[in-house]
Amino acid sequence: MRKPLIMIALTGLAMLGACKPTPPAAVKPQSALDVMERVMVSASSCWFKSGDPAFKSYRMDAELTSYSGQPRILLVRKGSGDIRPLLVVMAQGTPARLQAFGPVMNEPLSGRISADVKRWANGSSACH
């Protein structure tokens, strides 16, 4: 009588062991280029193609291929001969470390830029 109960209990334990969740796969750290490509696509879509009035006076230049390993996007004044960037968003390393700097980051728009860039770098493509 005990042997059948022990066998049933062992079978049950074996089945429970088979049901345990598998550990999540390790997430590969994103390279600077991967992150900046994602940020560039979302910035283009959300800031410029959407006609967002906050970015109407700017245009974006992307410099994703870089020998320095620091891909970046630049915002410059639209229609101006002055090509100095007003905003630089760049990443470096794996995992990517982001920076945003320039005169625009001293304006009220800086909070939105920071929030958008962080959201896009983390994988979302939502505009805001």
Annotated model-derived regions:
Residues L33-L74:
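Post-signal-peptide N-terminal segment of Sec-exported extracytoplasmic proteins
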Residues V41, R97, P103-H128:
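C-terminal partner/receptor-binding element of secreted or periplasmic proteins
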Residues P4-I6, P29-D34, R112-A115:
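Short, intrinsically disordered, charge-biased short linear motifs at domain edges
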Residues G69-V104:
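Mid-chain, structured segments of secreted extracytoplasmic proteins
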Residues V27-R38, M105-L109:
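Extracytoplasmic/periplasmic, Sec-exported soluble proteins
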Residues M1-C19:
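Sec-dependent bacterial lipoprotein signal peptides
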Residues L13-D34:
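Bacterial Sec signal peptide processing site at the extreme N-terminus
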